[in-house]
């Protein structure tokens, strides 16, 4: 069974990748196939094929950047990406964990705990866990150097945990609500998805009177991507857009105002004011937050 990890990002196995009913229901547009002999199976799907065996010594980390960019590009363009290996346990979970680490700033253990809340069988092998540890450490060091190099030049607001967790909280808790509302809470999971997400992300803010979450939600996580620049000098960093959340009184809808301004101060092509307004539903009202963070 395909499991939604974040809006636009799904985790499953080889059978899920061939299940036309599931693919259609989840509106899958992109698939990452990561196993020994990945092959494109459907004409209307964009594939990324990564031939990797599920053994601890395999350097799966070298595929992180390609996979992260593939997923990110898919989601930024409104698509839905399924990441699958043979059983949906180790290889695909490793890739999804690396992606969520990149766009939220969370450590791999926290991300894996959140994934297990919706897919209890998720379990990267020991070698892949070690590579996730190394990836997280290297990313944090790059982020620290990047922020230090910016202090004497352009503005670079410090990264705050509240900002980094904002999108993750909305996505994880909303996904958990949908799973509970549809009665699909995973068996053998000690905590419900919602309880596990709340334990990971902390208690939600006070819920205003009249707040009525709608399980049939549609959420877009708002991320900005740095200009890749000249081909000979590609930039590797992904940055989270400034996000402001405003609750609409008496409804479950809120407006996300996401600034897609680049680090150099320019705006995204085709969006001169640098602001994108998206409609979504979420579990809890959020206070407006505006900050930037780099990974």
UniProtKB/Swiss-Prot annotation:
Keywords: Cell membrane, Cytoplasm, Hydrolase, Lipoprotein, Membrane, Myristate, Protein phosphatase
Pfam families xrefs: DSPc
Any Gene Ontology CC annotation: plasma membrane
Residue ranges of every copy of the Tyrosine-protein phosphatase domain listed in the record: 1-141
Distribution of this protein across tissues and organs: Highly expressed in testis. Expressed in brain; up-regulated in patients with multiple sclerosis gray matter lesions.
Record's keyword annotation contains Transcription regulation: no
Catalysed transformations (reactions): O-phospho-L-tyrosyl-[protein] + H2O = L-tyrosyl-[protein] + phosphate; O-phospho-L-seryl-[protein] + H2O = L-seryl-[protein] + phosphate; O-phospho-L-threonyl-[protein] + H2O = L-threonyl-[protein] + phosphate
Compositional bias annotation for Polar residues: 251-270
Keyword Transferase listed: no
Positions in coiled-coil regions: none
EC nos: 3.1.3.16, 3.1.3.48
Subcellular location: Cytoplasm
Enzyme class name: hydrolase
Main localization category: cytoplasm
Chain segments carrying region Disordered: 251-272
Entry's Gene Ontology BP terms: dephosphorylation; negative regulation of transcription by RNA polymerase II; positive regulation of ERK1 and ERK2 cascade; regulation of oligodendrocyte differentiation; signal transduction
GO MF entry, a single one: protein tyrosine phosphatase activity
Residues forming the catalytic site: 85
Functional summary from the UniProt entry: May dephosphorylate MAPK13, ATF2, ERBB3, PDGFRB and SNX6.
PANTHER family: DUAL SPECIFICITY PROTEIN PHOSPHATASE 15 (PTHR45948:SF4), DUAL SPECIFICITY PROTEIN PHOSPHATASE DDB_G0269404-RELATED (PTHR45948)
Similarity field: Belongs to the protein-tyrosine phosphatase family. Non-receptor class dual specificity subfamily.
Name of this chain's protein: Dual specificity protein phosphatase 15
Protein source organism: Homo sapiens
UniProt gene name: DUSP15
């Amino acid at each position: 069974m395909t499991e939604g990890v974040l809006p636009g990002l799904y985790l499953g196995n080889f059978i899920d990748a061939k299940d036309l009913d599931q693919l259609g229901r989840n509106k899958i547009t992109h698939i990452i196939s990561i196993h020994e002999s990945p092959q494109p199976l459907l004409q209307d799907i964009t594939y990324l094929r990564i031939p990797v065996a599920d053994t601890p010594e395999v350097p799966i980390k070298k595929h992180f950047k390609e996979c992260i960019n593939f997923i990110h590009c898919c989601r930024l363009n409104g698509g839905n990406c399924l990441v699958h290996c043979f059983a949906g346990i180790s290889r695909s979970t490793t890739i999804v964990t690396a992606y969520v680490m990149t766009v939220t700033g969370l450590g791999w253990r926290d991300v894996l705990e959140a994934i297990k809340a919706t897919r209890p069988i998720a379990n990267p092998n020991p070698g892949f866990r070690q590579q996730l540890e190394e990836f997280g450490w290297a990313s944090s060091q790059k982020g620290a150097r990047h922020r230090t190099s910016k202090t004497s030049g352009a503005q670079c607001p410090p990264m705050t945990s509240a900002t980094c967790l904002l999108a993750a909280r909305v996505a994880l808790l909303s996904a958990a609500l949908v799973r509970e509302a549809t009665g699909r809470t995973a068996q053998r999971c000690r905590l419900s998805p919602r309880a596990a997400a709340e334990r990971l992300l902390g208690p939600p803010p006070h819920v205003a009177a009249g707040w009525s979450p709608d399980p049939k939600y549609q959420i877009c996580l708002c991320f900005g991507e740095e200009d890749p620049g000249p081909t000979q000098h590609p930039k590797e960093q992904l940055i989270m857009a400034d996000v402001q959340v405003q609750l609409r009184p008496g409804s479950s809808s809120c407006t996300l105002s996401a600034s897609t301004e680049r680090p150099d101060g320019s705006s995204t092509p085709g969006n001169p004011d640098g602001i994108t307004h998206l409609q979504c539903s979420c579990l809890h009202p959020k206070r407006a937050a505006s900050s930037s963070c780099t990974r």
